[in-house]
Amino acid sequence: MADPALVRALSFYVPAAVVVATVLAVRPDRRQGGAALLAGLWNATALLAVNVVAVRAGWWRFDSVGGELAGVPVDALLGWALLWGALPALLPERVPTTAVVAALVWVDLVAMPAGAPILVLGDAWLAGEALAVAIALIPGLVLARLTVSRRALPVRAAMQVVLFTALIFVGLAYVAVFANGGEWPDLEAGVAFQVTVLLAAPALAAVRELARRGGGTPFPFDPPDRLVTTGPYAYVANPMQLSCTLLLVAWGGLLRTWGLVAMAVVSASFAAGIAGWHETLELERRHGRAWSEYRRRVPVWRPRWRPWGGGTDPAVLYVAPGCDPCEGLARWLGARDPVRLDIRAATDAPTPVVRLTYIGPDGDQTAGVAAFARAVEHLNLAWAWLAWVLLLPGLARFVQLVIDAMGGGPLATPIGGCPRNGSPPPEAEVAGSLDGALRSDAM
């Protein structure tokens, strides 16, 4: 029988040595190294979940003592994540994905039975292997290759959100259970869900803004091409770090666990210290005076009450003339002096309009409930926070469906977008009255 200590050591050091040798041979650039890190983190998180499920389902169990996370040997988990995550991400793209997956699955099919005595396989262990391939190996490799090639930005951004959300909540769960003597503490699920949604909204809105306006992601090795100063970034320079810190503090209070508060302090200190210093240097190098001006106007941790209006052209909200609720909304917005938002009649829109339509300074367009949310972002922090909640994935569409079902659907005839030759469009007279009403209301 093999020595358990030797098996555990080999389970980490062999994959680590292979990864180091690959790095020395390939000499990955910054983006490829970042992709390897992302894939390794994805596999570490997903494989932890797979092993917890596998033990509960009886697919396999671990006979080990010490150095465990949720009953899984940490050294074996890290070695597995290096082999399935970092290693394939470092390989050249010319190596076919199917060949990489097939080779790594074959290695695992050989290594799993050889894991005795620390790993004891059940009769249905191949079910756990299939689950691991489906949610760890393949998604991690896809994320890595998309990151290196800069393809499918929405997919990359969404997968990063899933990854870092999982990392945060794995940390939350582990610290909370450890502090409670190995059991999950009592918690009102409804309250926890509402607090999480409320505090996570700015971070998710920031990810969306970086992808749609900046052409990149929050990950330092996959950054935006353009400086983003809209959305949450018009209020605070670090919306994601702020959301993460507030979440940890809030969950620490809900679970009465000081360890989570300590995690928040450490996280904030790191973000404000070494990470903040490095980020500032990098952004100054890439964006120059635009970044310096932005940082003078927008705090890092303390949000502004009103958004900063510099750095971009005004956004435009197009309102259908003759629509009483739309005109009322336009007057309501105009009376509150929105920052860098022009309100115009839909007859002036560059594309046909059937709903309230918002067009950002870069041409990004939304309609209906989402357009309302983007418009109120220009008012103040309270309205902006409501907008970020409303813009959570699926929520704006659900609210739009409810409004449509209650009779607030799109216009039967589109307005604007196709100017006629000769005389102005028949809506122009009504549009003029809308513009006049907005001007008189502003006065």
Question: Residue locations for each model-derived region?
Answer:
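Soluble, non-transmembrane catalytic domains of enzymes that act on hydrophobic metabolites at membranes
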Residues: 310-384, 408-443
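Aromatic-acidic/polar surface patches that form glycan- and anion
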Residues: 225, 235, 364-365, 391, ...
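Solvent-exposed interhelical
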Residues: 225, 230-236, 241
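Short phosphate-engaging motifs
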Residues: 241, 290, 325
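Glycine/small-residue-rich hydrophobic helix-like segments
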Residues: 239, 248, 364-367
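Short hydrophobic helices that act as membrane-entry/anchoring signals
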Residues: 230, 237, 377, 381-412
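A conserved hydrophobic position in a structured secondary element of the catalytic/binding core
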Residues: 202-205, 237, 321, 367
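Membrane-anchoring alpha-helices and their flanking helix-loop junctions
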Residues: 1-229, 245-316, 336, 397, ...
